Regions:
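Residues immediately within or flanking Cys/His clusters that coordinate Zn2+
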Residues: 30-33, 47
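Short, basic/aromatic beta-hairpin or loop at an interaction surface
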Residues: 85-100
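Cys/His-rich microdomains that often coordinate metals
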Residues: 42-43, 56-57
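Short, conserved beta-turn/loop elements at beta-strand boundaries and strand-helix junctions
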Residues: 58, 73-78, 109, 123-125
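Well-ordered alpha/beta subsegment
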Residues: 3-4, 97, 102-137
C-alpha cells in the first residue's frame, strides 16, 4: 500500500454577492473588474458602494489582463503548507488603471521589480479554485 501525501488546499476566499463574479470569471479565464454604473469608476477589491459617487449600482468589465507591478513583497515566513516559498505577491496596476493583489509566477522572487510588465495567467490551484496570477512579459 502506498501512502500519498496531498498538498493542503489554499485558504478559501470569503465569497459574497459583491465578489463572487470575480472568482466565477477566473474559472472561465476572465479577469472581471467591478465598474460603477453611475460614474464609471473601476474598483477592486469589489465592494457594495462606489467610493467616488456612493452609488450602489454596478456591473463588470473584462480587463485586458496586462499591467505593471506597482509594489510587491516577498513572503518568507510564516510558511503556510499550501504555498511555495519564497512567495512574491504584488500589487498589479492594470492597464485599465485599477489595482489588484496577486501572486507573481514564472520569475525568481529576487528578480521581481516595480514597473515590471506582467500579464494575467489563470491558475487552477485545486479542483475548486482558479486564481488570476501574473507572469512577467
Amino acid at each position: 500500500m502506498t501512502d500519498t501525501v496531498s498538498r493542503p488546499l489554499r485558504p478559501r476566499p470569503a465569497l459574497t454577492e459583491d465578489n463572487s463574479f470575480f472568482f466565477e470569471g477566473a474559472k472561465q479565464g476572465k479577469l472581471l473588474v467591478q465598474r460603477c454604473s453611475s460614474c464609471g469608476v473601476l474598483r477592486h477589491p469589489p465592494r457594495p458602494a462606489c467610493a467616488q459617487c456612493r452609488s450602489f449600482e454596478w456591473d463588470t468589465v473584462e480587463a485586458a489582463g496586462t499591467g505593471t507591478i506597482y509594489s510587491y513583497v516577498v513572503v518568507h515566513h510564516p510558511q503556510v503548507p499550501a504555498f511555495d516559498y519564497p512567495l512574491p505577491i504584488a500589487v498589479v496596476e492594470l492597464a485599465e488603471g485599477t489595482r489588484l493583489v496577486a501572486d507573481v509566477i514564472g520569475v525568481a522572487a529576487d528578480a521581481v521589480r516595480i514597473g515590471m510588465p506582467v500579464a494575467v495567467e489563470f491558475v487552477a490551484v485545486d479542483d475548486e479554485l482558479t486564481l488570476p496570477m501574473f507572469r512577467p512579459t
